[in-house]
Amino acid sequence: MSSDVPLLNDYKQDFLLKRFPQTVLGGPRLKLGYCAPPYIYVNQIVLFLMPWALGGTGTLLYQLDILRDYTAAALSGGLMVFTAAVIQLISVYARSKPVVVRRMRTRDILAEEDQHEFTSCAGAETVKFLIPGKKYVANTVFHSVLAGLVCGLGTWYLLPNRVTLLYGSPGATAVLFVFGWITLCIGEYSLIVNTATETATFQTQDTYEITPLMRPLYIFFFVSVDLAHRFIVNIPALEQMNQILHILFVLLPFLWALGTLPPPDALLFWAVEQVLEFGLGGSSMSTHLRLLVMFIVSAGAAVVSYFIPSTVGVVLFMTGLGFLLSLNPSDVSMVFRYGVTRHRVGSSHEARPGNSGHWFPWKECFLFIAVLGMALLEAGLLHHYVSVPQVSRSGAQAVVGYVLMVLLSIVWILRETQSIYIFGIFRNPFYPKDIHAVSVFYDKQNKLLKIGAVRWILLTLVSPLAMVAFLALDSSLHGLHSVSVSIGFTRAFRMVWQNTETALLETVVVSAVHMVSSTDCWWNRSLDTGIRLLLIGIMRDRLIQFITKLQFAVTVLLALWTEKKQHRKTTTTLCVLNTVFAPFVLGIIVLSTLLSSPLLPLFTLPVFLVGFPRPVQSWPGAVGTAACVCTDSVFYHQMVPRLTAALQTAMAAGSLGLLLPGSHYLGRFEDRLIWIMILECGYTYCCINVKGLELQETSCHTAEAQRVDEVFESAFQREHPQVCSLNEHLENVLTPCTVLPVKLYSDARNVLTGIIDSPDNLKEFKDDLIKVLVWVLIQHCSKRPSTQENKTENTGEASPALPPAANSSPCPESLEDSESANSDWSDGSIFDDEPAIKNRKEKLQSKDLPCTKLPIPGSVDSQNPDDHSAGTGPKNDLYRTVILGLPAVDKGQREDVAYIPLVEFSCSQSRLLSLPEEWRSNSTPRSKILEMSALFPEDWYQFVLRQLECFHSEEKSRVLEEIAKDKALKDLYVHTVMACYIGLFGIDNGVPSPGQLVRVYNGGLPWAGTLDWLSEKPELFHLVRKAFRYTLKLMVDKASLGPIEDFKELTNCLREYERDWYIGLVSEEQWKRAILEEKPCLFCLGYESSMGVYTSRVLMLQEMSVHIGKLNAEAVRGQWANLSWELLYATNDDEERYSIQAHPLLLRNLTVQAADPPLGYPIFSSKPLPIHLC
């Protein structure tokens, strides 16, 4: 990115000057960008000031002592309801009146959609422009009533006498009154006239018109505090809050314009998430529905615990329910469904194999039951027999506190040994040195994982039970019930299981503070242990957020100064301003930390704003429902099960660090990038979302991908790393964690220059093609069920005599043609031909059931059920010559047309390998087939027959020998193989060109008289294309690995293709299916038109090393929050979004890709994936 690229080019500047004032004022469009009549602006000003006029009427009557304060508020509200209703009715009438709006001619294409021609001050087109109206009638009524409430309560809120009582200053009253009513007018205008485009946008589409409610919602909040202060007197804190909020009230327009205040839907989910996590001890959830359900259940648990009379009962209830609520809700529902099913089925469940326990998580279930039983027994006994009502520093609880300190130290040390860097700074001396020696590397890593197993035992079994003992011994549980005890201890007993590692840290901090502080201090005297843990939990979370936000801000500032490509003309100015106003910048960081909202760097420059608070997911839609799917998405789809299995081991051992909802990880292998986000965490499980980023690397993508490779290489691939050396890329948002062995597809692309265009290879290709055709057809016929054998059993009727072939009348539509309409023209039969053939044979058998005329034993049946149904009998069908599809010919040419008379095999078993009758009829001249038959490899043909495994009798070798000597069968294969060969290359037996090979490989046939004959037989066509692709792959292998020595080696090679390879095209559905079924190898041929070369692509399924690194979560949230701003106001010299430009330190391009569509464009996004850490 060059330094002179403007953040806002000309048309974006004009757009900003139109859009931003509209956002600030709540909707009035005072700058249109084209000439409009003055009444357009006058009307908007009148509508904007209408609430002030109505509220001013009530205020004036109150100041003149004509009305009481609440009466004046009611009068203003009533007038506003009437006015809003009239405005909405006018809008409905204008929209129902047909009007032709003519566009104004202009050269500014970008602004055309906003330009209209107005005819009168109160015309329909003017009204529709000023007041767009509501989509729903209910909203029309609701918003009108709501506007009246806002106006009435706002009048009451800003009464001069009331404001003077708060501040005692007429000057302050005047200022707050004027600017306060501007705030009210902004809120009213967006509600009843025209809604502004909000910078704080959460949903991509406002389907239910929630956006107009955003500004009135915050007005109601400010008014509610004032009402509470009015009716609840003698509370100094409430009075001070009311004074502060009155000042903030006049600043609301700027907070709305800057996008600091969240929209209602984001505010709801954020508030529920915060209360669930910090007030009730839960975790953010993977879906909004699970979040709401878990919040209701958790809140209900806290309420129920308040009404339990027995202290032992309270302890047991909190322990048991805290454990159950920390489990994966999906697992709990599975156990419930299993129990209901067992109850319904009863003793008859043995008759249903589908209900067997192979799918049920018995191991986890037994573990949970055992741990829950131990926890309940421990908590009940300790609380009843050991716990004392007095606080003591030398009691049993203090001893347990020391034990928890030791456990925390051990668990943290063991966790840090699993990652490449200790605290992300110093290289771990115990981690394997070099990944180049793969086997040695993984052997050493497995030893570390054994240490991780010790950590898992301490963290999953020992620590929760120790913390339950610490809480059960607390003296606060012996006192009378209070709200603080119910909330605090409900959360504490839940956190023990929900997030054991953070709960362990919080408990140790509380225990340590209690030991070192005085018993008379406010912390120990006024707060019980549950509330202390709650406050420590909030401080812990906010401290982590503050540190990561500060790291993010420093990285943005350093990148602007150190990265040459990020230099701009304003670089020095921005750096100086950030240094001078460092306290102000620090205050912004603190504010965003307190609100748990993203720190938004405008255009990823050190111009920081506070983004609006939002849930951890950052996006409103369901996880995994949106992605820009392409042909490469299937690689990530195949990868997900393997990756989750590898992540399960790494997460359980602690290789990925502290697992918290909202954490982001980046995986890298070959040219693929994986984005992993933790959605929720619980006892022995976490839920993740995996996104796959594009493989088609752009220049910006490549620049950041190279930096990612550098970060991982410096960590894992240094030949002689120093002990405890520093992380060389400490300033980067990516910190390497570990390497995972995952079975994935490696992708190799090669240029076939010198192979596919070699004359010698092309000549050998033609000879090999005939051999492969023979092998494919014999293998196909040997594996399919034999219908002829079924048809010839128990026959006692004599067959009709053979009529001369020359007198055969033209036959009706053949059986293959009748089936072609229902046949599946797909690539599924290339490697999976048996099921397709079986289905076709079943259709043939079902159609042949009514037939009573059976063929001569040893002959080829050619009955047509259509003829039978017509009553014509099979007399002429047995010996007909199929010549359909041929062009008209004269008698001289007629004699050269190939026909197949009745075939009589010398071996009775030959019929098992006979080709279908419809394949043997073709339009190829018989003389040409006879001429080309010399190319048929008879020795190879006999060798393939002798290698068949379809006969299992004791006389297998004798039967195969007889079949190999059957001349009729051989002639049948010669005729069909050579006809297919001619169908591929035409009548002229020339050397094919590379372009011709690629065309046939892709499924195209050269134009010839045999084209229709071959293409009209889908099954045969697919087999021929399969043989052609095998032959081309064989040519590439011979050029790379050397020539084939003998027939046995060739057979083994073809069997390997059949068993382990899929050879086809990337665009075929079978290619995707082969990847999902994990075919060991895949091959594809292509042509690179830009370079003019032929290429091959080979995929090999093998265990690969996937590098995993942890991203700065706040850097991700901040850049995602910045996207809406850039979509509105940013651009660059390529007319692209500014944010997709490469930023090697922030990984800006990759971060934008990982955002949910339409802002981002990942090519794959998984559903929430549960990972069981046990």
From Swiss-Prot:
Membrane-spanning parts: 40-60, 72-92, 140-160, 173-193, 217-237, 244-264, 284-304, 307-327, 366-386, 394-414, 451-471, 543-563, 580-600, 643-663
Membrane topology label: Multi-pass membrane protein
Known glycosylation sites: N790, N1122, N1149
Biased segments, Low complexity type: 798-810
InterPro entries assigned: Pecanex, Pecanex_C
This protein's UniProt keywords: Glycoprotein, Membrane, Transmembrane, Transmembrane helix
Protein localization: Membrane
UniProt KW Transmembrane helix keyword: yes
Extent of Basic and acidic residues compositional bias: 835-846
Chief localisation class: membrane
Pfam families (alphabetical): Pecanex_C
Region (Disordered): 785-875
GO cellular component, as recorded: membrane
Name under which the protein is recorded: Pecanex-like protein 4
Organism: Mus musculus
Gene: Pcnx4
